[in-house]
């Protein structure tokens, strides 16, 4: 039995990640695919993260980074098991978000990556570009929904994309929604059909 593919959607806040994830979930047989999003706010760490994001509590940046990282590690075994059982996982945000947001606040990229080192490695990361309209919508109630900060996050994403050690697929914001939906579906289906070998380890 071939393993499942680990496919991650990344991008700035309000770039359409969840919408595109749901489009994929509707396009592929339900018994072969599952959806997972981070942070998972139902866990102990997730509830602490939710309190921070919604401005109910404050923590220093180092604690925040570790909380987000721990939240992903809580699901590392689940991700590994699902992939080995032939289930493809569509993941809305992953370690790349953690690193981009942490480094945008001044953390070391090397240190931030070290916290995530060893997590299951994605077979494909789809990065959704944001147009000016989406970027200007990044003003909201949660703590990171700020246009200036989101621009800093974007620069950190670009640094990771340029490293070339992960298979990134960048989706332009200029595509019409129906074209974007079909393009992403085809990219995901190809990734599922061509995945080979054991699950890798991220940044090892």
From Swiss-Prot:
The record ties this protein, via PANTHER family, to: THYMIDYLATE KINASE (PTHR10344:SF1)
Subunit info here reads: Homodimer; the dimer arrangement is orthogonal and not antiparallel as in human enzyme.
Identification of the protein by name: Thymidylate kinase
Q: Which InterPro entries does the entry mention? A: P-loop_NTPase (IPR027417), Thymidylate_kin-like_dom (IPR039430), Thymidylate_kinase (IPR018094)
| Protein encoded by which gene | OPG178
Family from the record? Belongs to the thymidylate kinase family.
User: Carries keyword RNA-binding?
Assistant: no
Q: What does this protein do?
A: Poxvirus TMP kinase is able to phosphorylate dTMP, dUMP and also dGMP from any purine and pyrimidine nucleoside triphosphate. The large substrate specificity is explained by the presence of a canal connecting the edge of the dimer interface to the TMP base binding pocket, canal not found in the human homolog.
């Amino acid at each position: 039995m071939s393993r499942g593919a680990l496919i991650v959607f990344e991008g700035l806040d309000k770039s359409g990640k969840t919408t595109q994830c749901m489009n994929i979930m509707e396009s592929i047989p339900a018994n072969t695919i599952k959806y997972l999003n981070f942070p998972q706010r139902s866990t102990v760490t997730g509830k602490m993260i939710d309190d921070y994001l919604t401005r109910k509590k404050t923590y220093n940046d180092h604690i925040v980074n570790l909380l987000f990282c721990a939240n992903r590690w809580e699901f590392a075994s689940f991700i590994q098991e699902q992939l080995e059982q032939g289930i493809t996982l569509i993941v809305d945000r992953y370690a790349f978000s953690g690193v981009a947001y942490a480094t945008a606040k001044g953390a070391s990229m090397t240190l931030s990556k070290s916290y995530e080192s060893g997590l299951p490695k994605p077979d494909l990361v789809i990065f959704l570009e944001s147009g000016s309209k989406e970027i200007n919508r990044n003003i909201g109630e949660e703590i990171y929904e700020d246009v200036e900060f989101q621009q800093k996050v974007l620069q950190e994403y670009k640094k990771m994309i340029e490293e070339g050690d992960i298979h990134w697929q960048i989706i332009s914001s200029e595509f019409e929604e129906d074209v974007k939906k079909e393009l992403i579906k085809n990219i995901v289906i190809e990734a599922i059909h061509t995945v080979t070998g054991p699950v890798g380890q991220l940044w090892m």
